[in-house]
């Protein structure tokens, strides 16, 4: 059940930033910093676009994703996971 929730949170987050075209900074596990907008994703990878160029990024290589602007995924107060 926890794995299902984590997957749903990941999909919800990625779908939100894709639909709103929120600029992201993505850090890979090797320290490389990527920036761009998510245009597509699946269970294993995402497509990141910047300056008219697209990069296919494998999710297993991603360490951290930081949105360029605050996002609100769920309605409610401070602890929406309860």
Curated annotation (Swiss-Prot):
A biological process from GO: regulation of RNA stability
Keywords: RNA-binding, Stress response
SUPFAM superfamilies: Sm-like ribonucleoproteins
Superkingdom, taxonomy of origin: Bacteria
One cellular-component annotation, GO: cytosol
Pfam families: Hfq
Ranges where the Sm domain occurs: 11-71
Entry function: RNA chaperone that binds small regulatory RNA (sRNAs) and mRNAs to facilitate mRNA translational regulation in response to envelope stress, environmental stress and changes in metabolite concentrations. Also binds with high specificity to tRNAs.
A GO term, aspect molecular function: RNA binding
Keyword RNA-binding: yes
Subunit structure comment from the entry: Homohexamer.
Family: Belongs to the Hfq family.
InterPro entries: Hfq (IPR005001), LSM_dom_sf (IPR010920), Sm (IPR047575)
Name of the molecule in the record: RNA-binding protein Hfq
UniProt KW Ribosomal protein keyword: no
